[in-house]
UniProtKB/Swiss-Prot annotation:
SMART domains: HTH_XRE
Protein name: Uncharacterized HTH-type transcriptional regulator RC0668
CDD domains found in the cross-reference section: HTH_XRE
Keyword Transcription (UniProt): yes
Keyword NAD: no
Signal sequence segment: none
Naturally occurring in which organism (per UniProt): Rickettsia conorii (strain ATCC VR-613 / Malish 7)
Keywords recorded for this protein, A-Z: DNA-binding, Transcription, Transcription regulation
InterPro entries in the record: Cro/C1-type_HTH, Lambda_DNA-bd_dom_sf
Regions recorded as binding DNA: 30-49
PROSITE patterns: HTH_CROC1
Molecular-function GO terms, alphabetical: DNA binding
Residue span(s) of domain HTH cro/C1-type: 19-73
Length: 125
């Protein structure tokens, strides 16, 4: 049952983020949208942060208020719920090294790091 609850939470969070970003894109404050859909701004915040689950009826009101079809809130949901790959410790380290390398501004320093890695890679264990 825990996995199902995780999926439900991810869906609630996905929809909440869509509400939040669309509200901001439309230039509406939380208070303004809350008044249109007849809830408090605190309740709207709970929907946006997936603290409270939103009913379909309320989601329809939000879609109308934000001039969107209700389908908008579900677009991309399937992709968002795909399990993320689990990285091994080695893969995480490679990602970290790559990210840190990209932060080096100097071409000379990047070349020095590259030469060091080549040297270490050529060593026999």
């Amino acid at each position: 049952m825990g996995r199902k609850n995780d999926i439900i939470q991810k869906i609630d969070s996905f929809i909440g983020k869509k509400i939040y970003s669309l509200r901001l894109a439309k230039g509406l404050s939380r208070q303004q949208l809350a008044e249109v859909i007849d809830v408090t701004h605190q309740q709207l915040q709970k929907y946006e942060k997936a603290i409270n689950r939103i009913s379909v009826g309320r989601l329809v009101l939000i879609a109308e208020a934000l001039d969107r079809n209700i389908d908008y809130f579900f677009e991309g949901l399937e992709e968002a719920n795909k399990p993320q790959p689990v990285h091994t410790q080695h893969q995480r380290m490679c990602i970290e090294v790559s990210r840190n390398f990209m932060k080096i501004n100097s071409t000379e320093e990047q070349q020095a790091v590259n030469n060091l890695v080549k040297c270490l890679a050529g060593k026999k264990n």
